[in-house]
């Protein structure tokens, strides 16, 4: 495992796409692994707010730099994949770095995507770069499937179910409760609701009818379990609108049984065709993920290839998954794709 190769590398002479990673948490580590699986790409640098000497990466040919040195790399990186959080990092970081690099991010605050798009678009055009935002699986792959399904079945209803999987935001909310030492929260689709949609019943579903929440909580010594459970179940914006189950377990059990970050979900559209709307159809796209951040990272890396291709064509400005032709995601040529996948 590499530890102390710090900055100063010259641009590689190989023809691979040069990738930079900004932020080395779960998502950044996932990007590093994904780059390894793509033969046309090369990780050249990881940028961190921490002391670079304290950051251990896996790629022996890449270097670790402080974010303060990022401008020195403007001509050495083809695409910068920004792996910060949506709450406070990405709204600031992506516009700043879009002036210097082609950039990819996973901004997932749905209500603020139009605002974020406008900010990144202005910055990317100013710098002459391509920025692709809100890349991942929701937003991202789920968004694409909603668009395809709406275009194909204009008379219909959309349904999205998440899980079963770990919600990192809700897990953080549990851990903020007084008396909680540690915890994980799983979002679980209600099977009866999912079955009704698949049967073409077009149900009108409330928040509570679509998902349940299951919490596994480690208490601080001497904490009041009943009080903690009540505070979790009544927490607005997180648990109060759901049927929530709280399990109290030991730290050992949590570490043993709940250390992974699985997730997934379903996007469905139920629609009808025919002059009298006599025929019903269901479109369904589903994901079952052992590692939410590693899958998201794999999507980010595919869209990094698209950003590189668009930049080579002279394009600039902000894009989303809606704007990228599928062929731009692939390392294969058009001829190869038509022969092997079409």
Where do the PLM segments sit?
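Glycine-rich Rossmann-fold phosphate-binding loop(s) that bind the pyrophosphate
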Residues: 24
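Rossmann-fold NAD(P) dinucleotide-binding segment
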Residues: 72-73, 87-106
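Hydrophobic/small residue at the entry helix of a nucleotide-binding pocket
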Residues: 27
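N-terminal Rossmann-like NAD(P) cofactor-binding module of classical short-chain dehydrogenase/reductase
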Residues: 79-82, 104
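Oxidoreductase and adenylate-handling cofactor-binding alpha/beta cores
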Residues: 141-157, 172-182, 306
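C-terminal substrate-binding/catalytic lobe of Rossmann-fold NAD(P)-dependent oxidoreductases
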Residues: 18, 30, 37-70, 166-304
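NAD(P)-dependent Rossmann-like dehydrogenase/reductase catalytic/cofactor-binding core
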Residues: 281-342
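Rossmann-fold NAD(P)-binding glycine/threonine-rich loop
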Residues: 107-131
């Amino acid at each position: 495992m590499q530890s102390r190769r710090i900055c100063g590398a010259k641009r590689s002479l190989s023809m691979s796409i040069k990738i930079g990673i900004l932020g080395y948490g779960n998502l950044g580590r996932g990007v590093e692994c994904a780059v390894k699986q793509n033969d046309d790409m090369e990780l050249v640098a990881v940028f961190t707010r921490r002391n670079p000497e304290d950051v251990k990466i896996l790629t022996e040919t890449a270097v670790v730099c402080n974010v303060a040195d990022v401008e020195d790399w403007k001509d050495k990186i083809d695409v910068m994949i920004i792996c910060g959080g949506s709450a406070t990092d990405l709204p600031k970081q992506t516009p700043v770095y879009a002036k210097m690099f082609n950039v990819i991010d996973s901004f997932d605050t749905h209500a603020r995507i139009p605002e974020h798009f406008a900010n990144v678009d202005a910055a990317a055009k100013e710098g002459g770069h391509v920025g692709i935002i809100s890349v991942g699986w929701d937003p991202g792959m789920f968004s694409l499937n909603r668009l395809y399904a709406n275009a194909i079945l204009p008379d219909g209803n959309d349904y999205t179910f998440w899980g079963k999987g770990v919600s990192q935001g809700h897990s953080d909310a549990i851990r903020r409760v007084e008396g909680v030492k540690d915890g994980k929260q799983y979002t679980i689709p209600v099977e009866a609701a999912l079955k009704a949609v698949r049967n073409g019943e077009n149900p009108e579903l409330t928040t509570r009818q679509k998902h349940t929440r299951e919490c596994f909580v480690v208490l601080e010594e001497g904490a009041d379990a009943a009080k903690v459970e009540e505070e979790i179940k009544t927490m607005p914006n997180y648990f109060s609108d759901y049927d929530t189950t709280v399990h109290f377990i030991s730290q050992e059990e949590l570490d043993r049984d709940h250390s992974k970050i699985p997730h997934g979900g379903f996007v469905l559209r139920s629609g009808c065709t025919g002059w009298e709307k006599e025929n019903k159809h269901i479109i369904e796209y589903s994901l079952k993920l052992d590692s939410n951040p590693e899958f998201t990272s794999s999507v980010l890396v595919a869209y990094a290839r698209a950003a590189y291709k668009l930049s080579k064509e002279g394009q600039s400005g902000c894009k989303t998954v809606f704007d990228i032709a599928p062929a731009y995601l692939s390392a294969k040529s058009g001829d190869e794709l038509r022969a092997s996948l079409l």
